[in-house]
Amino acid sequence: MPQLDTSTWFLTILSVMLTLFTLLQPKISMHLYTPNPKPMPTKTQKQHSPWNTAWTKIYLPLL
């Protein structure tokens, strides 16, 4: 059974990495990032449900 020839692997891996870097570098450098991202204020809304004030088997409103 012949041995696997790994003598060209270094050159292959190096050329693939160089090619990927060359192809992806312009895409990454052209990407625009926002200068100062600010969080959006969130507003909570009260839900009006019929069981908020009505008596049910699991809820008795405080009087």
From Swiss-Prot:
GO terms for cellular component: mitochondrial membrane; proton-transporting ATP synthase complex. It comes from the Eukaryota. The keyword Membrane applies. One of its GO terms (biological process) is proton motive force-driven ATP synthesis. The modification N6-acetyllysine is found at residue 57. Subunit 8, of the mitochondrial membrane ATP synthase complex (F(1)F(0) ATP synthase or Complex V) that produces ATP from ADP in the presence of a proton gradient across the membrane which is generated by electron transport complexes of the respiratory chain. ATP synthase complex consist of a soluble F(1) head domain - the catalytic core - and a membrane F(1) domain - the membrane proton channel. These two domains are linked by a central stalk rotating inside the F(1) region and a stationary peripheral stalk. Component of the ATP synthase complex composed at least of ATP5F1A/subunit alpha, ATP5F1B/subunit beta, ATP5MC1/subunit c (homooctomer), MT-ATP6/subunit a, MT-ATP8/subunit 8, ATP5ME/subunit e, ATP5MF/subunit f, ATP5MG/subunit g, ATP5MK/subunit k, ATP5MJ/subunit j, ATP5F1C/subunit gamma, ATP5F1D/subunit delta, ATP5F1E/subunit epsilon, ATP5PF/subunit F6, ATP5PB/subunit b, ATP5PD/subunit d, ATP5PO/subunit OSCP. Belongs to the ATPase protein 8 family. This is ATP synthase F(0) complex subunit 8. The gene is MT-ATP8.
